[in-house]
Amino acid sequence: MSISTVDDLSFYSNVEPNQQRFTEVVKTFQTNFPGDDITFFARSPGRVNLIGDHIDYNFFPVLPMAIANDVIAAVNVNSTNEIIITNTDSKDFLKEVIALRNSQIDQEHHSWANYFKCALIVAKQYLEERGVTSLKGMKLTFNGNVPTGGGLSSSAAFCVASTLAIIRANGITDLTKQDLTRITVVSEHYVGVNTGGMDQCASVCGEPDKLLLI
């Protein structure tokens, strides 16, 4: 099953506040990158787990579901040699510039950019599988309403949205949910987070009003 695209925000149960979020993302993007166009948006939801916390990475079953809270990103694709990430919450998430030639994670530099680099690492590997060896530059503005540290997988939502954005920016339009799940399951391992795949699978494969037995 391929990743779907949307023409409106009707997939949200409550459209108005999310329309305001998208408007805020657009305005912040235009402020951060005046004169640059938004090429597309990327989105990935958080998740809640009903049964089986912290046992997925020991190969036991879990029962999560995706939630409406999500991470969204306005994405510009360009021909530079860098990726610039910004956030509507510029106080807590500072602007970061990431060189395409060096996605190495600096464990001494505790920054949200490390999680984006996790996405960049796995996206690069997938793109190489597909024959893409030269990456596009990007400019992104993120917004997230998945509570950080709230047990709803804000980091997984961020990594999945980032991975999806990178792959789409580099011309892949037939990415499947299976492949996106496969490559993002290990993404947070690069910052030392022990994940077993529940978070990413729920974020990628979750459907409205449905639980996932994983």
UniProtKB/Swiss-Prot annotation:
- At the top of the EC hierarchy, this enzyme's class is transferase
Give the pathway: Carbohydrate metabolism; galactose metabolism
- Classification via InterPro entries: Galactokinase (IPR000705), Galactokinase_CS (IPR019741), GalKase_N (IPR019539), GHMP_kinase_N_dom (IPR006204), GHMP_knse_ATP-bd_CS (IPR006203), Ribosomal_Su5_D2-typ_SF (IPR020568), Ribsml_uS5_D2-typ_fold_subgr (IPR014721)
A GO molecular function held by the record: ATP binding
Q: Which residues form the active site?
A: 199
Q: Where is the signal peptide?
A: none
Q: Which GO terms describe its cellular component?
A: cytosol
List keywords of the entry alphabetically. ATP-binding, Carbohydrate metabolism, Galactose metabolism, Kinase, Nucleotide-binding, Transferase
Reaction catalyzed: alpha-D-galactose + ATP = alpha-D-galactose 1-phosphate + ADP + H(+)
Which GO biological process categories is it annotated with?
A: galactose metabolic process
- Domain of life according to the entry: Eukaryota
EC no. given is: 2.7.1.6
In which residues is ATP bound? 149, 151, 153-154
Q: Which Pfam families match?
A: GalKase_gal_bdg, GHMP_kinases_N
Site positions for Transition state stabilizer: 47
The family database entries (Gene3D superfamilies) matched by this protein are listed as: 3.30.230.10
Tell me the residue numbers annotated for binding alpha-D-galactose.
Answer: 47, 53-54, 56, 199
Q: Which residues form a coiled coil?
A: none
The entry's family comment says: Belongs to the GHMP kinase family. GalK subfamily.
> What role is this protein assigned?
Galactokinase is a key enzyme in the galactose metabolism where it catalyzes the conversion of alpha-D-galactose to galactose 1-phosphate. Can also induce the transcription of the gal genes in response to the organism being challenged with galactose as the sole source of carbon.
- Protein's recorded name: Galactokinase
Organism in which the protein naturally occurs = Candida maltosa (Yeast)
The opening ranks of the lineage are:
Eukaryota, Fungi, Dikarya, Ascomycota, Saccharomycotina
